[in-house]
């Protein structure tokens, strides 16, 4: 089992809105630093672009198409030397609904 110095929490964040993601990252890093834990990040990961091709016409005209895309922005934050106060503060943190959070200990 890892000792307290070797423990780390890895937080992966995903969102469609980059600004919402960045504000969430800032809040997590600020909370970790306030509880005397070392926060590394946010580390930006490659943005995933998903492109959808749709026919404009409901019937014929296959030549007329329209493209839509969704961009998924991702970040990683590593928190080293977390204490019980750090974990409690992160659990109480209120983050926006548009951000998907995955936590690994």
From Swiss-Prot:
SUPFAM superfamilies: Ribosomal protein S10. SMART domains: Ribosomal_S10. Gene3D superfamilies: Ribosomal protein S10 domain. Keywords: Ribonucleoprotein, Ribosomal protein. Signal peptide: none annotated. Pfam families: Ribosomal_S10. Disulfide bonds: none annotated. The keyword Nucleus does not apply. GO terms for biological process: translation. The keyword Ribonucleoprotein applies. GO terms for cellular component: ribonucleoprotein complex; ribosome. Involved in the binding of tRNA to the ribosomes. Part of the 30S ribosomal subunit. NCBIfam families: PRK00596.1, rpsJ_bact. This is Small ribosomal subunit protein uS10. It comes from Synechococcus elongatus (strain ATCC 33912 / PCC 7942 / FACHB-805) (Anacystis nidulans R2). The lineage of its organism: Bacteria, Bacillati, Cyanobacteriota, Cyanophyceae, Synechococcales.
């Amino acid at each position: 089992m890892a000792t307290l110095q070797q423990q780390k929490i890895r937080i992966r964040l995903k969102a469609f809105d980059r600004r919402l993601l960045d504000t969430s990252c800032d809040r997590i890093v600020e909370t970790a630093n306030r509880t005397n834990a070392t926060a590394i990040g946010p580390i930006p990961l490659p943005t995933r672009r998903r492109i959808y091709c749709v026919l404009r016409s409901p019937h014929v005209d296959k030549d007329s198409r329209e493209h839509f895309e969704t961009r998924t922005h991702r970040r990683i934050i590593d928190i080293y030397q977390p204490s019980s106060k750090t974990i409690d503060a992160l659990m109480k943190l209120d983050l926006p609904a548009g951000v998907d959070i995955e936590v690994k200990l």
